[in-house]
Amino acid sequence: MQPTDSKTSTSDTTEQPNETQTITIPPSKKKSKPSSKTRRRLKDAEPLPFAIDGLSHDGRGVAVYGNGFVEADGHITDKHGKKIFVSFALPGESALVKITNSRTSFEEGDAVNITANPNPERVVPPCPHFGVCGGCNLQHWQPEAQINFKQSVLAEMLVHQANVAPDHWLEPVVGDRLGYRTKARLGVRYVAKKETALVGFRERSSNFLAELNECHILDPRIGFEIENLKTLISTLESRNKIAQLELAMGEYLPELPDGDQPVALIVRNLEPLSDADIDKLKVFFAARNWQLYLQPKGADSIQRIALTAADDLSEQFGRLYYQLPEYDLTFEFIPTDFTQVNLSVNRQMTKLACDLLDLKAGERVLDLFSGLGNFSLPLARLVGETGSVVGVEGSEAMTIRAADNARRNGINNTEFYSQDLTHDCTDKPWANQGFDALLIDPPRSGAWEIMQYLPKFNAERIVYVSCNPATLARDTKALLEQGYRLTHAGVMDMFCHTGHVESIARFEKVSA
């Protein structure tokens, strides 16, 4: 794999650390705890010195116990060759490591001090909560290094599972490195002893909520309102009964109705709220022009709360929007819909996918896992009125939303169908008309079931968008066996500062 240079976002600033860096990490509250005897031993144990030799696929440092390794108490360990996965450590560094979890085949730990050879790509994390909060795990590493590492993960998995490398590596797709996340679920818990509410992500490897005042990964419309949300919830009579906030944000479009605010929060309340509590929420949300929803039970119980007398509650949800200006498209969605969390990367991703398919006017395209039309509609623009796009999606609600978005954007060369794609659907009328190109954007589990019947579509070109490089590599092997060649592959930094790898690959049918 050739090294690549990624673009630098103006929203990201990094500071170089000192020659040594102390990282203060609170005791880890593990979900699956070792025995009480082991817990006491780990808690009392002194940090141990290790040389960091490499990185795991999730971005943790990897070290190995050497022969005759001497622990701090002078005892010579018998763990020769045992691996330790070390959070916050980078290759080449010497670190003092606090062991937090010990298992038969490996151990886990935190780097509490970099004692020598700090990696030149190490930076000071921009967020004050980094190391405690589990929302991200790579802020100590330059973003450019992160994305190159993610490409190396993809390359390794393609070789390991499919014994292949692409003909061409794509330039990594990068966008905003901070303030990019427009969808999330934040936990809520009121702590009576501190007389305050906690709002945010869970601590690393724990069910406990991290004590946050702000979040640098969330869109700043919410990320810098966390302290205000904590204060608000602390004043409610039902502060002990608020369990979660589900947030969704769209883009602000001046031409849209005033009632369609670009920020929506669903408050998961475990018991009905009093009128006084609802009034407090309404005042807070109205001041920020946010949509307010309450959810006392399942998804069907979500109820929008009117903030003014003019609010139209004839439908369960207000609308949110995002755009793909390259294709003159505006998408409408509701807060519970699946959408990509990074709008700037999504714009680049859709264009890249369309470019890779190299469509011509009049061609037929199949879009599997089409959602609300994020790829289908740009593809429809490219094939023109003489071409067509068929979108297939498991969710009937999303299928309806996609058709609505097509109609709203004046697109009439698309068809959308709701179908369980884990079963062979090639006997359906829409499936047997032949396709020139195919786009697939499956969930993390990949598209193994589809690989079994995909040859029946007889597509010349395939673009596969993946949120899990392991399943992409597995499915790549199946495509190679079916007569396709991997022409292009690359990664997209949809979740910067995390170990999450979003990738894209193009396949071309080999001529007989």
Curated annotation (Swiss-Prot):
Segments forming domain TRAM: 41-113
Protein's UniProt keywords contain Ligase = no
User: Per the UniProt record, which EC number(s) apply here?
Assistant: 2.1.1.190
Sequence positions that bind S-adenosyl-L-methionine: 340, 369, 374, 393, 420, 441
| Ranges for region Disordered | 1-45
Kindly indicate whether the keyword Iron belongs to this entry. Answer: yes
Q: Which residues form a coiled coil?
A: none
Which portions of the chain have biased composition (kind: Low complexity)? 1-14
What's a GO biological-process term for it?
A: rRNA base methylation
Top-rank taxon: Bacteria
Q: What class of enzyme is it?
A: transferase
Q: Basic residues: which segments have biased composition?
A: 28-42
State the disulfide connectivity. none
- Catalytic reaction list: uridine(1939) in 23S rRNA + S-adenosyl-L-methionine = 5-methyluridine(1939) in 23S rRNA + S-adenosyl-L-homocysteine + H(+)
Q: Where is the composition biased (Polar residues)?
A: 15-25
Positions with a binding annotation for [4Fe-4S] cluster: 127, 133, 136, 215
The entry sums up its family as follows: Belongs to the class I-like SAM-binding methyltransferase superfamily. RNA M5U methyltransferase family. RlmD subfamily.
Function of the protein: Catalyzes the formation of 5-methyl-uridine at position 1939 (m5U1939) in 23S rRNA.
Put simply, this protein is called 23S rRNA (uracil(1939)-C(5))-methyltransferase RlmD
